[in-house]
Amino acid sequence: MLRRLLERPCTLALLVGSQLAVMMYLSLGGFRSLSALFGRDQGPTFDYSHPRDVYSNLSHLPGAPGGPPAPQGLPYCPERSPLLVGPVSVSFSPVPSLAEIVERNPRVEPGGRYRPAGCEPRSRTAIIVPHRAREHHLRLLLYHLHPFLQRQQLAYGIYVIHQAGNGTFNRAKLLNVGVREALRDEEWDCLFLHDVDLLPENDHNLYVCDPRGPRHVAVAMNKFGYSLPYPQYFGGVSALTPDQYLKMNGFPNEYWGWGGEDDDIATRVRLAGMKISRPPTSVGHYKMVKHRGDKGNEENPHRFDLLVRTQNSWTQDGMNSLTYQLLARELGPLYTNITADIGTDPRGPRAPSGPRYPPGSSQAFRQEMLQRRPPARPGPPPTANHTALRGSH
């Protein structure tokens, strides 16, 4: 009965009307009052009016650029890196060249890999960035993110997942491709799913996962008045362990175009028996690069119809139904480029094609990934944001 109710046109109209009402409220400046209503933890106080240069303190990193690999048996890196500076400046102009970014990051290895030289990192984090036709945004992100992560003393790698062709953009499916390909390379502790146009403003926002559940990291974007737009928002930048990602069957593959997938993902977290955690609002600051609407990423007219079916579709639509054709894998000086044909919207003239990953069921794929996980390392586990992942929300 409930299912029939959700599929009625009047119900969809109500959902559309509700979203329009919320958007109107937020556009009139309601973000801060909404944040207060939901009691978001503001966290420690930072002075964002006097940010430091994003390349500050890199001269204090141990080890010479391009030096030999770090010896075995090093002590763990401190939970809170002494190199952190807090708020960092974010500039969108001029856009740096790739050569300039390479020159300023001599410790970054091919494929966008980095590992601290003087201590054992507490987390191995893969940054996965869906991408198409945003070259300026990508260069800004790489210029900003590499020094940001090095100061946190993490082992990390950056993966840029490029959607081939001119079909409708599918952010969530590209993230599934990125997770699949990143886990072929290494047993990452943490998967950071990162929009290309968001730059972090505070290096106390640690790029590590919360073992208790998925983290939504971009809690305070300038686009939304540096407040969380609504409690279940999960867009922009999020972090999950591989086990958490597989437990919710990854992200949906059927959201072609803009909108809807973030709410679907938040629902998956709940249906998989997990809760979203967040850093304090004062820590999770991000600036969005200004841009016009993307051709091929128009508003998804089917998003509400898909959302009302999430409760029944999430176990069938995700990593266990992922299809794509890997066209290229290139180790660039700043990132690993993955180019994939993910097909087109099945409501269009051609359905997705390519090899199926995995060849078996979702249980078989999950078992494969779990078997690839290494035994627990001795010593303290990776630590989440030192300002405390304050409770679940």
UniProtKB/Swiss-Prot annotation:
Binding positions (UDP-alpha-D-galactose): 130-134, 169-171, 196-197, 226, 258, 291-293
GO MF, one example: metal ion binding
Compartment(s) of residence: Golgi apparatus, Golgi stack membrane
Cofactor(s) required for function per UniProt: Mn(2+)
Record-listed Mn(2+) binding positions: D197, H291
GO terms, biological process: carbohydrate metabolic process; galactosylceramide biosynthetic process; protein glycosylation
Disulfide bonds, paired cysteine numbers: C77-C119, C190-C209
Pathway(s) of this molecule: Protein modification; protein glycosylation
KW Cell membrane (keyword) present: no
EC assignment: 2.4.1.-, 2.4.1.38, 2.4.1.90, 2.4.1.275
Cytoplasmic side: 1-10
Signal sequence range: none
Example of a GO cellular component annotation carried by this entry: cytosol
Keyword Glycosyltransferase appears in the UniProt entry: yes
Matches recorded under Gene3D superfamilies: Spore Coat Polysaccharide Biosynthesis Protein SpsA, Chain A
Region (Disordered): 339-393
Highest rank taxon of the organism: Eukaryota
Residues binding N-acetyl-D-glucosamine: G260, E261, D262, D263, R303
Glycosylation sites: N57, N166, N337, N385
Alphabetical keyword list: Disulfide bond, Glycoprotein, Glycosyltransferase, Golgi apparatus, Lipid metabolism, Manganese, Membrane, Metal-binding, Signal-anchor, Transferase, Transmembrane, Transmembrane helix
InterPro entries the UniProt entry points to: Galactosyl_T, Galactosyl_T_C, Galactosyl_T_N, Nucleotide-diphossugar_trans
Pfam families assigned: Glyco_transf_7C, Glyco_transf_7N
UniProt catalytic activity: an N-acetyl-beta-D-glucosaminyl derivative + UDP-alpha-D-galactose = a beta-D-galactosyl-(1->4)-N-acetyl-beta-D-glucosaminyl derivative + UDP + H(+); N-acetyl-D-glucosamine + UDP-alpha-D-galactose = beta-D-galactosyl-(1->4)-N-acetyl-D-glucosamine + UDP + H(+); a beta-D-GlcNAc-(1->3)-beta-D-Gal-(1->4)-beta-D-Glc-(1<->1)-Cer(d18:1(4E)) + UDP-alpha-D-galactose = a neolactoside nLc4Cer(d18:1(4E)) + UDP + H(+); a beta-D-glucosylceramide + UDP-alpha-D-galactose = a beta-D-galactosyl-(1->4)-beta-D-glucosyl-(1<->1)-ceramide + UDP + H(+)
Transmembrane segments: 11-31
Family of this protein: Belongs to the glycosyltransferase 7 family.
Name of protein: Beta-1,4-galactosyltransferase 3
Protein source organism: Pongo abelii (Sumatran orangutan)
Name of the gene this protein is made from: B4GALT3
